[in-house]
């Protein structure tokens, strides 16, 4: 399967730096990366916290459907200057977004860079002995679901030391980029593998909604519900021994909510897709 898909696993300190700063902004939606325990721990270890202006944080929350691109460009850029140029050229963010959010946000990123990079390099060294097992676990998981991951010619997984909550996926001409938490133990390895499956399901099921998917109109919730149920059907068919673990990971209450929210014919369609 690996030969067919082309799996590449990397570590990207600039993306981790950006997500370190994002982890300090409460968002209150499905893309929220805020983690109070992480914020406290990193303040103790670095002796500082990002100085994000509250007005910039408010702009991020209020205009998230436009400025969310800020969480994806770091995967394919190597620094702030390149990232800002990519954001300006994207056509998604206007000058007001740049002035009120992107520029003050990236000033905070640059102020954190030296302290964070020193911490990151130390973390890389500390986790060196766990990397082979973590990477092998992802490769084996992809082989297990070979028919599913065969939808992708190339997958690049960035394992992150900063990501605390929700994974990310970004499609570009170079293939699929996934941003996943580096697993600290076996339970974390299961979480990372299931997050990989979750993120890779979105491009298959999201088009079935037939419109732009946004946070502010509820369509993102429906997109998530589709993924919840598709993956449940897929795991039941391909790896039934993981089914209860998956249900606990998603949350059984969320699976029930998905079944209530989606029409029976849509649920049947998702089951049929997962069985192809």
Labelled PLM ranges:
Residues 71-122:
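Interaction-surface and assembly-scaffold signal
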Residues 116-173:
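Auxiliary, metal-adjacent structural segments of Zn-dependent hydrolase domains
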Residues 173-188:
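Acidic, His- and aromatic-enriched active-site or binding-groove loops in soluble protein domains
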Residues 190-210:
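Active-site recognition of the HExxH zinc-binding catalytic motif
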Residues 218-276:
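Long, well-structured alpha-helical subdomains associated
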């Amino acid at each position: 399967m690996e030969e067919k898909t082309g799996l590449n696993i990397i570590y990207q300190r600039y993306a981790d730096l950006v997500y370190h700063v994002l982890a300090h902004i409460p968002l209150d939606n499905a893309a929220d990366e805020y983690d109070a325990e992480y914020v406290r721990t990193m303040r103790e270890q670095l002796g500082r916290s990002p100085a994000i202006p509250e007005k910039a944080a408010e702009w991020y929350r209020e205009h998230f459907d436009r400025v969310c691109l800020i969480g994806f460009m770091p995967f394919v850029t190597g620094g702030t200057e390149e990232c800002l140029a990519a954001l300006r050229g994207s056509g998604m963010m206007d000058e007001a977004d740049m002035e009120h959010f992107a520029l003050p946000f990236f000033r905070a990123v640059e102020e954190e860079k030296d302290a964070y990079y020193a911490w990151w390099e130390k973390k890389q060294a500390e986790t060196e002995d766990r990397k082979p097992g973590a990477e092998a676990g992802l490769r084996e998981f992809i082989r297990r679901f070979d028919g599913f991951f065969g939808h992708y010619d190339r997958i690049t997984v960035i394992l992150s030391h900063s990501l605390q909550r929700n994974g990310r996926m970004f499609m570009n001409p170079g293939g699929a980029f996934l941003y996943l938490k580096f697993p600290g133990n076996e339970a974390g390895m299961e979480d990372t593998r299931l997050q990989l499956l979750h993120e890779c399901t979105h491009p298959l099921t999201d088009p079935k909604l037939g419109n732009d998917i946004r946070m502010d109109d509820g369509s993102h919730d429906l997109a998530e519900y589709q993924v919840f149920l598709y993956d449940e059907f897929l795991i039941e068919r391909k790896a039934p021994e993981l089914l209860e673990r998956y249900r606990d990971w998603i949350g059984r209450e969320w699976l029930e909510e998905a079944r209530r929210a989606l029409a029976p014919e849509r649920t049947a369609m998702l089951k049929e897709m997962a069985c192809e």
